[in-house]
């Protein structure tokens, strides 16, 4: 039986009504991943939160968006999502010595819009080490979910590997694939880094990633594609927005 850790979600515009015995609720979910003092104290270790056993694999926000992660029996994180409030350096600096947790550290001094907490996603190239779904609409049988967007950024580890190994022609791209239970597939993408003869660009600031082109979906799966195998598939996500409607 899968269990979830519950966190708050801000409903920006909510309408609920009862009509002939039916319940209807429509709102825009703004997922910021901020936690209470109790949650930071009891669930996070070294500023990172990973589910403690293979039965506890998801973050459930406002009952509807499910962010999945995969861990082994010994508790090692393998792929998908975890939460972090590790902070990096500003404006692309890499002056500090490398750390073992740089994979889970955003390469910015805070989360998006100054928030404390964000999620880190790892696209493990070994498929069996990944959760079945990355992001799931929990009430997909009772309503609809249309992702609107989020903020994304690189981790410190990725920024360091790019600096060490990227050459002209190399590129790092984040892809989001939306699917429904009937098989409809939609996609969106954003460039996280690109080296060309004219310019080298690396994402060092929280950047909007528009997801409305995915339309109404049941699941969103992420893929990090690099032309250079030395750059691992991590990225940071914060401020997830989705338009949700539930009826029952």
List where the protein language model places each region.
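Short beta-strands within extracellular/lumenal beta-sheet-rich domains
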Residues: 123-146
């Amino acid at each position: 039986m899968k269990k979830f850790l519950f966190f708050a979600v801000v409903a920006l515009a909510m309408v609920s009504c009862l009509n002939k015995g039916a319940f209807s609720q429509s709102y825009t979910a703004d997922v910021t991943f901020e936690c209470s003092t109790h949650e930071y104290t009891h669930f996070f270790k070294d500023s990172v939160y990973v589910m403690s056993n293979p039965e506890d694999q998801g973050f459930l926000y406002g009952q509807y968006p499910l962010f999945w992660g995969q861990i082994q029996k010994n508790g090692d994180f393998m792929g998908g999502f975890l939460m972090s409030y590790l902070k990096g350096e500003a404006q692309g600096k890499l002056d500090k010595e490398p750390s073992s947790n740089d994979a889970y550290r955003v390469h910015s001094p805070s989360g998006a819009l100054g928030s404390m907490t964000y999620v880190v996603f790892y696209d493990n190239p070994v498929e069996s080490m990944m959760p079945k779904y990355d992001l799931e609409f929990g009430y997909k049988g009772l309503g609809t979910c249309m992702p609107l967007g989020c903020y994304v950024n690189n981790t410190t580890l990725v920024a360091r590997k790019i600096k060490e190994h990227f050459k002209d022609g190399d590129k790092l791209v984040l892809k989001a694939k939306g699917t429904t239970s009937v098989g409809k597939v939609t996609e969106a993408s954003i460039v996280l880094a690109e080296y060309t003869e004219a310019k080298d660009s690396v994402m060092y600031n929280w950047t909007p990633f528009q997801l409305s082109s995915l339309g109404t979906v049941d699941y969103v799966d992420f893929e990090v594609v690099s032309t250079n195998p030395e750059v691992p598939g991590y990225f940071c996500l914060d401020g997830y927005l989705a338009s949700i409607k539930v009826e029952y």
